[in-house]
C-alpha cells in the first residue's frame, strides 16, 4: 500500500525504504553515507539491502553521535529535511518529548538484535540521548516492547538523579 514517509517510519516499512533507495540510486546514496559519516559507510550487499543484510555497520556510540548531529541540525542535509525527520521521530511517550526509532533484525544464525535509539527533550536543558541494544536467541513475546521500555526506564533513573 502507499505510505507517506511518516507512516513508513512508524511501521518500519522495509519495502517503502527499499523503493526509496532504489529511486535515489547507489551513487547518491553512497554520497549521503559518506557526507553524513554514517557508521562504516559501506553499501556492500546492494543498494536496497546494504543496511539490512549487507555490510553497513554502526555502533551505538556512532548512532548517538549521529542523533546529536541530527538534533543540532549539524548533518549535511537541508534544515527543513532534518526538521521533518525530527518531527517524524517524535513519539507520544512522556508527553511527546521522546524522539527515536526502534528496530529488530534476525541474523542467519537466529540471533535477534533489537534496539532503541533517540533522545529525551528537556526544558532548558541538554537532551538526554540513548541507545539501547538487546540480543537474544529467544526473544519471547515482550521483545517488541521491551526495547523502548528499557530505554525509558533508564531515562527515568537519570532524570531522578538530576
Where on the chain are the PLM-derived regions?
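Catalytic-loop motifs flanking and including active-site residues across diverse enzymes
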Residues: 13-16, 59-62, 113, 147
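Mid-domain, small-residue-enriched loop/turn segments at the edges of structured enzyme/sensor domains
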Residues: 1, 5, 17-72
Amino acid at each position: 500500500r502507499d505510505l507517506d514517509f511518516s507512516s513508513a517510519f512508524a511501521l518500519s516499512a522495509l519495502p517503502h525504504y527499499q523503493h526509496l533507495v532504489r529511486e535515489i540510486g547507489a551513487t547518491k546514496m553512497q554520497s549521503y553515507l559518506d557526507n553524513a559519516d554514517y557508521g562504516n559507510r559501506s553499501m556492500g550487499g546492494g543498494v536496497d539491502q546494504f543496511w539490512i543484510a549487507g555490510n553497513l555497520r554502526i555502533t551505538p556510540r556512532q548512532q548517538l553521535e549521529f542523533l546529536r548531529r541530527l538534533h543540532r541540525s549539524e548533518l549535511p542535509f537541508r534544515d527543513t529535511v532534518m526538521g521533518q525527520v525530527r518531527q517524524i521521530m517524535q513519539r507520544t511517550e512522556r508527553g511527546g518529548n521522546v524522539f527515536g526509532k526502534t528496530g529488530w533484525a534476525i541474523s542467519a544464525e537466529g540471533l535477534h538484535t533489537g534496539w532503541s535509539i533517540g533522545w529525551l527533550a528537556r526544558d532548558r536543558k541538554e537532551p538526554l540521548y540513548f541507545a539501547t541494544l538487546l540480543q537474544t536467541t529467544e526473544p519471547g513475546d515482550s521483545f517488541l516492547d521491551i526495547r523502548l521500555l528499557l530505554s525509558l526506564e533508564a531515562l527515568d533513573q537519570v532524570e531522578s538523579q538530576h
